[in-house]
Amino acid sequence: MAAPQDLDIAVWLALVHLEQYADTFRRHGLATAGAAQHLGHEELRHLGISATGHRKRILRLLRAGSAEGFLDSHLDNTMEPTPSPAPDAQPPKPVPKPRTVFGLSNPATAQRPGLSPIFWDPEVSRNSECTQRSSPLLPSSSEQPSVPNTMEMMPNAIYFGLDLRGRAQAAQDVTPDSSQATVPTPAFRPTTGTVHIMDPGCLYYGVQPVGIPGASDRRDGRGVCQERAEHRQDLETREDAGYASLELPGDSILSLPTQDAETSDDLISPYASFSSTADRPVPLLSGWLDKLSPQGNYVFQRRFVQFNGRSLMYFGSDKDPFPKGVIPLTAIEMTRSSKDNKFQVITGQRVFVFRTESEAQRDLWCSTLQSCLKEQRLLGHPRPPHPPRPLRTGTLELRGHKAKVFAALIPGELALYKSEQAFSLGIGICFIELQGCSVRETKSRSFDLLTPHRCFSFTAESGGARQSWAAALQEAVTETLSDYEVAEKVWSNPANRHCADCRASRPDWAAVNLGVVICKQCAGQHRALGSGISKVQSLKLDTSVWSNEIVQLFIVLGNDRANCFWAGALPPGEGLHPDSAPGPRGEFISRKYKLGLFRKPHPRHPDHSQLLQALCAAMAGPNLLKNMAQLLCVETSEGEEPLSPSALNGSLLSLLPSDSPGVYNEVVVPATYRGFLYCGSISNKAGAPPLRRGRDAPPRLWCVLGAALEMFASESSPEPLSLLQPQDIVCLGVSPPPADPGDLDRFPFSFELILTGGRIQHFATDGADSLEAWISAVGKWFSPLSCHQLLGPGLLRMGRLWLRSPSHAGLAPGLWLSGFGLLRGDHLFLCPAPGPGPPAPEDMVHLRRLQEISVVSAADTPDKKEHLVLVETGRTLYLQGEGRLDFAAWNTAIGGAAGGGGTGLQEQQMSRGDIPIIVDACISFVTQHGLRLEGVYRKGGARARSLRLLAEFRRDARSVKLRPREHFVEDVTDTLKRFFRELDDPVTSARLLPRWREAAELSQKNQRLEKYKEVISCLPRVNRRTLATLIGHLYRVQKCASLNQMCTRNLALLFAPSVFQTDGRGEHEVRVLQELIDGYISVFDIDSDQAAQIDLEVSLITTWKDVQLSQAGDLIMEVYIEQQLPDNCVTLKVSPTLTAEELTNQVLEMRGAASGTDLWVTFEILEHGELERPLHPKEKVLEQALQWCQLPEPCSASLLLRKVSMAHAGCLFTGVRRESPRVGLLRCREEPPRLLGNRFQERFFLVRGRCLLLLKEKKSSKPEREWSLEGAKVYLGIRKKLKPPTLWGFTLILEKMHLCLSCMDEEEMWDWTTSILKAQHDDQQSVVLRRRSSSDLARQKFGTMPLLPIRGDDSGATLLSANQTLRRLHNRRTLSMFFPMKSPQGSVEEQDELEEPVYEEPVYEEVGAFPELTKDTTFSSTWEWSAKSDPSLTSQRSFDQPPLSKASMLGHEERIPDPPPGPPSKSSSQARGSLEEQLLQELNNLILRKGEPASCPESSSQPTSPQAPSPTSLPTPTPSLPTQPPCTSNPPSSQPLT
């Protein structure tokens, strides 16, 4: 390739497809091709060209241009021989001409301008011993004119030691017309002795012997050309040592490069990743020296100093990986020695003084430095150096360093300098290589750079500067992992330089099974489709999967041909553009590939799902090119024929260089690695302790990984001490770092191998790089090929696994699938693996999105092995290890990876909708228990409880259960706000904060809402869904503002600092949040059905709040009788303590229904009657009804009364317990399917105590499975979609699963149902069959607001008796309002209560919670019996004291009916009124009996005139007047009870 000197640099680089570096060349003053002629490997590396293949292309282009430039400048010149000097003349000292040489890997074989032509022999390149074809650029020697030799050249190793004697004779032997060409001879050739030569591979002067006259033949008989070929082969071998082995082509061109500059580039494997073995130069000189301190106090400090030929570095110790100072050789002006064994290194900024231990050591340092300085100037390297342009510079604070440092970020490394002036001179503190590093942002303005050897903590000048530095470092670290070899080859097809979906330039991702090259944004949407549809790989990172055949496919196919297939029917104007939002982008890609809406019908696969399966199979099978060509039958334009497989193969062959056969024939080489490892002994114990240093430290062995892992005592040992075969490895695990950073005895970098037979062996390395290299090598060594692409940083465990899932039942029903698991980060990858069972399909599990992780013990499994159950949305996976040891390791690793602990939103454990569990749980709790709380989210809870709750959520959110009696609403709201406030990045994204503010500044509200929608679409998926959930919750809160007094403005003020993580003074953020809450329906595209459901829920909550104003907390509910028809509906108040038996009695009395011989039972109806649950008579009805809000359709639930025969449900109303437990054979099925599968199977079940047991046999003593019945609900019926085998069955709903049980007949179904209900309520007393309400006024707790007593306390024996009497009076008064009273019956308990001692205490309204007072006894019957036995007592007690008035449930007074004038009547109504008055009189006497003074015993018999009680007066003794006689005839002041 010819390159004229004045050719523009961009055009010149485009010849090798590297025009992206044109700007880099121009920034360094290289605008034309001629200005770049002096560049070599190191110069290109300093320019920022890190890819080795790119540097090789440019150097080959330079060599080609240099050869042609030499020919152009010398073809017209004549070559005349140089006259020989006199024999006795003193030989002149050769002086080398300053020039630029190439590195070892790029020997300049072409003549450079100004070089003597005697060192360039064109005949050598035509020698048949060196090459099989001649170069068209080389003329014959007869055509070359001679040029006078104006300067003698010194022999140099760069010319491969060419023999300088007899060149003319050699040229005459091979030239057709030797008489016309005279080959010049050197001006001086020493006959014996030595000459000083410069080796470009070394940076010091050396001495090489020169042959004596007559020694034209080599010692081993090899010719010049053969030595040149071997020398070049040795150089290329050293340079390409980091590449995978390839089959070299038969024709190896070892002479001047030809016009085909891409031939040698093809020798690089397209999937190879280069790791240079000579990046770090070997130190030429090192040792301990004393360095003079720069503070001026003349103090020498002990330093370890190294000089590697490029820079002088001094360290604190010989173990430190990073120096304290770096002095580049280019910054040193001179070195000179001084007295006292000291020498000075002089730079333009300061003088460095070092002191050695001896004079000889000082002279060695001085001579070495001075010789390298001379060689540097002879080579013509510029001084000071011209490094690549920094990506970012600035001042930073470094922890552990007193003053600020000046940091410069260049490609591949971060350089630290003391000042900007030191940066300009190149004198730095240290240079940190970014390969293998990571960046971590910490609090405030700080960030950490984590290297394998040390953590550098920096502090920026501001928060914005910290983010900029962290982003730039992260991008630079990512760039170090990139390999452009595959990308350059794929981009050689111009159609692949633009994304196949959105036309973005330079796409660096590809969907390998779809044949398209895509950009990074589209790659994320392709990944969302799943690996079964689109297998996404990176062109720069995932280089291990890019075989030569796949690269050829993409080169030939191209995006244009692929789009002819995938988008052949795409309507114009419906494509994507590079700036498309993620939402429309994902929808378009799903329609294009997942649904195949834009492709034309396929002749062989009309079903799109079959086509996708065939594409995946073609990528994994042989004959990739042929199969893909048949599947992707490309539609061409009219007049053209589609690309056939033969045409495809032909086009592929046409792309291959004709002179390089076999280039793409890869030689499969097994994974090899070698190095030292600390090898522990093989143990059989689970959880063996990690390796530790000290006396019991494991031996450090030399390990070689090839066909087997062999361990030797040393590198020279002939026999291995032990070896491991790949089939012996079950699992590989990376040991976590020590929990205590101060634990220096433990090896921080270690891994373990679990072997067959339950054995384990630990290994340890010296550093993180070595550990990662060993993990990658061993992982590829024993794992299948499908796992190799998944290896990388973050690997925790990999090994063989057994997999079973109901979703794979069609593939292998009832069988375990053989797979290979790989745990990386929080993802578990499952790959097919060879084994006795069928291979498992490729799959991936996001562990943090699991709903449940549990272990089924070996006793509960048929195969007597432990199973790990992973419950995900829509499916359940069962994992089983090879043995106990590896299963325990997998369980621990998966449990740790599935947990939380981070402060990032993506690091949280997720619920079904990709919402953090902590957010979902807190919002659900507040919705259920806090929407009615006044000042919700404004009232703060206890800080300690809130912090403790947040820590529990972060540790394991799945295990946290919020319960009303254990957690307060205020603590939960504080936890939710604190969680959003402490996120690493706010839920609204810090980078989008300017866009939020820009949207808030728009004038029109409609425009602002549309802008909000646009910004929300730019958020990540988790952020977008979490924000939508939070705003929806706040929308419901403000809907209940009439109850909780929290309007939209208040909520926005409270949540803006947490959602946007601002200081709370941002008015724009408050406005944004307020408008998001108000416009929730439109911004988040809520449809009308969802909006109606929200309004229904809010209306129901509001109704509950209105009814709660009554002390009893009653709720108005609808109850149906027999059928759910409007005519059969009864509306009544339901108190929180109303039981199902009491509800039944009230409804039947209201409707006047007769009981007869059948029983009436209250049923809870779900899913419009598909499931029916009989309520136990003692169950609280309101507690069950309040749980309907958690249902997907709350309106589908209701209460229904139905007649049930005494034989079916009679046992529920008796206190008799079953003597023998219920046991029988049932057909069962689990939802979701687990141990029992997804079909109904016959199993024996047993109800024992409060547990349901699953038995293998009827007489089995140990159950296979056990379920607690605490909190379980039993429903009659089974969902129809499950296809139950019989019509009679019931569903048992447990906490995390549903158990469907099918019976043979109705009697068996009722027998099992009542047995379970009896087991759940076996501590309840027997039910009394009566028709009256026994609702008490016990203390209620509705939501989180307990109903406190109105006046005083409710404890004490006196109050107990008073409340008991008031309850009976209230019950009788209430019952008389609904239905006639029954005849009272006396009881012994009531007689005992009258004899209890009472004390003088003030009477309070009944507000206490006394469970022992729930029995319905009639106190009036006792008094009636007493009155009949002693009439005088009746007349006396009737008028001793004014009667007490009765207190109602609401606390207000009720009038007592006035007795009619005249003598008492014997009618029933008059007797009933007189009886109540007598009861009140007796109650008053009971309370005040103890307070009667002893001085007036006659008062009880003193006659008094009868006095009718005033309807408004209420005689009440007060505590302030304890001495007032209670027997006085004058009533006290009219005051209510206090």
Swiss-Prot record:
Membrane topology annotation: Peripheral membrane protein
Biased composition (Low complexity): 1476-1486, 1494-1505
Modification Phosphotyrosine, positions: Y1399, Y1404
Effect listed in the UniProt record for changing Y1399F: Strongly reduces phosphorylation by CSK
Site, as annotated: Arginine finger: R938
Comp. bias (Polar residues): 1425-1439
Pfam families: ArfGap, PH, RA, RhoGAP, SAM_2
Residue ranges annotated for the Rho-GAP domain, each copy included: 903-1084
Residue ranges of domain Arf-GAP in the record: 479-606
CDD domains xref list: ArfGap_ARAP3 (cd17902), PH1_ARAP (cd13253), PH2_ARAP (cd13254), PH5_ARAP (cd13259), RhoGAP_ARAP (cd04385), SAM_Arap1_2_3 (cd09490)
Listed result of changing R938L: Loss of Rho GAP activity. Enhances cell spreading
Domain Ras-associating span(s) in chain numbering: 1113-1206
Complex and partners: Interacts (via SAM domain) with INPPL1/SHIP2.
Protein name in UniProt: Arf-GAP with Rho-GAP domain, ANK repeat and PH domain-containing protein 3
